């Protein structure tokens, strides 16, 4: 092995055993394969995907129990079998990497790679980063950037791709449906692109965060036929609809509503993923004669991962507007239940060094050394 710090034999980790069954356990520290690095986790962020994994007990492509889960993290390299990163380097890593050999990689669509390598295991004191991810999607973070900010890179990279896919332009009227963590990131990036952004969500506390991120109009209601008409009438030129609508909920109903709310010649990004087997019924006359362009955005690319880190490091995306508290590794099961009940902030930083029961504010996270 190239270089390393002192590493214990075992570590504390949150292990998924099945549906709604997460246990804090002492397990062996992961062994490294050639080209891997071992990272001491300073911060791992909660994620809607992790909540789904917790509720379902598995993820078809990424995780089968029993297994440590969590995939948004930043930390310090403590052992390296890779010349790019030495022990002591602080890094953020994405949760996947493409092969660059398949048909889609040759088309420069690495997010659609036939052999996309996924990695999990961030809800632990240490996490192994596989060699391919080290080579493609592992970045050094600035010395003054808190880990709880840097860990936002992976989801933000997905949002960067979503906004780039629909090429939002300055002065456009953009509607984001849903103000969950990714909806908020999509809204902020649309603001940075120069758009006038409207966000609709039925939870006022989420919309308060959207306003902090520069969203011009926030509407705290569930979408209905009456609200669709009012949104067009009040927030779009000539009452024709929005230039671009981004759906960030992941339901067939809101996918359809997104199509209804866009203007003729406009673009829709069906960003929110629906459960497998969900079917969509749309008015084909509307699509064809109004020339509606439909997009869907999945995952991230090495390019958008790097752009995401730049947005965070330069504070163009104020990470602690989203990451609003820090909790301990021991408290993760409780945090997941709070997320399930809709009582959690957009993002919670899970901090392995934090004592059980402690809770840090965003201001305290700024100074916390993981």
Enumerate the language-model features and the residues they cover:
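N-terminal glycine-rich cofactor-binding segment
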Residues: 14-31, 48-79, 106-120
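Glycine-rich cofactor phosphate-binding loops and adjacent beta1-alpha1 units
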Residues: 166, 213-292, 356-360, 364-369
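Short glycine-centered segments of the SAM/dcSAM-binding site in methyltransferase folds
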Residues: 90, 173, 266-267, 293
């Amino acid at each position: 092995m190239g270089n390393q710090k002192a590493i214990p034999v075992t570590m504390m980790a949150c292990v998924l055993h099945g549906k709604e069954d997460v246990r804090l356990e002492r397990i062996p520290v992961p062994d490294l394969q050639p080209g891997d690095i071992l990272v001491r986790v300073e911060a791992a962020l909660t994620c809607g995907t992790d909540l789904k994994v917790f509720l379902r007990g598995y993820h078809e492509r990424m995780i089968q129990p029993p297994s440590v889960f969590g995939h948004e993290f930043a930390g310090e390299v403590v052992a390296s079998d890779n010349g790019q990163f030495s022990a002591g380097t602080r890094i953020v890593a994405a949760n996947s990497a493409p092969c660059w050999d398949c048909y889609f990689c040759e088309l420069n669509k690495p997010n659609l790679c036939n052999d996309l390598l996924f990695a999990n295991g961030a809800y632990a004191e240490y996490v192994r980063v596989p060699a391919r991810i080290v080579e493609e999607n592992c970045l050094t973070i600035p010395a003054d950037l808190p880990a709880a900010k840097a860990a936002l890179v992976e989801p933000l990279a997905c949002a960067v791709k979503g906004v780039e896919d629909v090429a939002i332009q300055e002065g456009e009227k953009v509607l984001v449906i849903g103000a969950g963590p990714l909806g908020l990131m999509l809204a902020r990036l649309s603001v940075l692109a120069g758009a006038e952004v409207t966000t609709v969500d039925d939870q006022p506390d989420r919309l308060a965060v959207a306003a902090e991120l520069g969203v011009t109009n926030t509407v705290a209601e569930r979408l209905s036929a009456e609200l669709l008409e009012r949104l067009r009438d009040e927030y779009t030129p000539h009452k024709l609809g929005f230039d671009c609508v981004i759906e960030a909920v992941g339901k067939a109903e809101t996918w359809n509503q997104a199509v209804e709310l866009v203007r003729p010649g406009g673009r829709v990004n069906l960003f929110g993923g629906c459960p497998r087997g969900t079917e969509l019924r749309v008015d084909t006359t509307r699509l064809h004669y109004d020339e509606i362009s439909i997009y869907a955005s999945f995952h991230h690319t090495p390019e958008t991962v790097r752009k995401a880190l730049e947005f965070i490091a330069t504070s163009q995306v104020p990470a602690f507007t989203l990451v609003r508290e820090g909790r301990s590794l021991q408290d993760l099961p409780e945090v997941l239940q709070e997320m399930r009940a809709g009582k959690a902030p957009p993002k919670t930083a899970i901090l392995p060094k934090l004592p059980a029961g402690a809770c840090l504010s965003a201001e305290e996270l700024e100074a916390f050394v993981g």
